[in-house]
């Protein structure tokens, strides 16, 4: 967590939020940088999540940093989390009450890779069509 919110575009390390703004600034702080990558950042209040593959710092303890182990593809988990929104009307921390109990179906590793490849192929086609329409 950053000690100071004295951000500057001159600094090197991005400070992240899992929400819409994503990079909220840059810090010159060198301690506590998350550099065991890739990770998924998860906002405990909004349930937004993002896959991150570059070193960063966080602004708030309301953001969880998630890693995979063994034969679990992080892209597969990130895509699964992006379509799974367990959000209600109350302002609460959703990680402990909801998401930590979520059972994610984990197919064999090669199937995870196939699913990710299919999703990315579809997204690339959508981007290509959108660009052609612009």
Pin down the residues of each PLM region:
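Amphipathic alpha-helical coiled-coil/heptad-repeat segments
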Residues: 102-134
């Amino acid at each position: 967590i950053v000690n100071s919110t004295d951000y500057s575009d001159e600094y090197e390390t991005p400070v992240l939020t899992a929400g819409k703004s994503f990079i909220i600034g840059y810090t010159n702080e060198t301690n506590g940088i998350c550099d065991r990558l890739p990770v998924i950042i998860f906002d405990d209040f909004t349930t937004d999540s993002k896959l991150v593959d570059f070193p960063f710092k966080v602004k708030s303890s309301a953001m969880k940093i998630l890693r995979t182990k063994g034969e679990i593809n992080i892209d597969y988990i990130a895509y699964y989390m992006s379509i799974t929104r367990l959000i209600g009307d109350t302002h609460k921390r959703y990680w402990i009450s909801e998401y930590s109990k979520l059972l994610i179906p984990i197919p064999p590793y090669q199937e995870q890779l196939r699913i990710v490849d299919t999703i990315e192929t579809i997204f690339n086609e959508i981007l290509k069509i959108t660009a052609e329409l612009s």
